[in-house]
Amino acid sequence: MDEASIRARLVRHWEYSATDQDIAHEIYHEDAVLEFPQSGERFVGVQNFREWRRIYPAKLEFEIRRITGSGSVWVAENSISYDGGPWNLTVSILEFRGDKVTHERIYITQPWDAPGWRARWRDQSVVAR
């Protein structure tokens, strides 16, 4: 699959991730693996993570920040908000087999204020949070 098609599939995935789990999960192979290293969770088989996402107890919003990759490995940087709360930063590392995702690792974190002691080395432009 060409890079433009993969990018379009990833955009579609996040556009529907908060509203339609059937469409959002079209991107995965049936035997796909989803991991959250921060919580130590691993889900094997798309049906397992699609089902808990259907009943997720918070209203989610996603904002795509950047998608980059080539070949079978892609990285997506997103922002996510739970129930209209503060935005968290996410990084997803996605491995493709053919035209579908076979493995995804998601890292989620909150932004933090830059420490003053690093200021003299820091570029003065601001990275969007």
What are these regions (language model features)?
Residues 4-8, 21-72:
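A solvent-exposed, acidic/Ser-Thr-rich amphipathic alpha-helical stretch
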Residues 1-26, 30, 121-129:
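Short, low-complexity N-terminal intrinsically disordered segments enriched in polar/charged residues
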Residues 13, 34-35, 77:
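Alpha-helix C-capping/helix-to-loop hinge sites
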Residues 1-2, 50-129:
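A beta-strand edge to alpha-helix "cap/lid" segment located at domain peripheries
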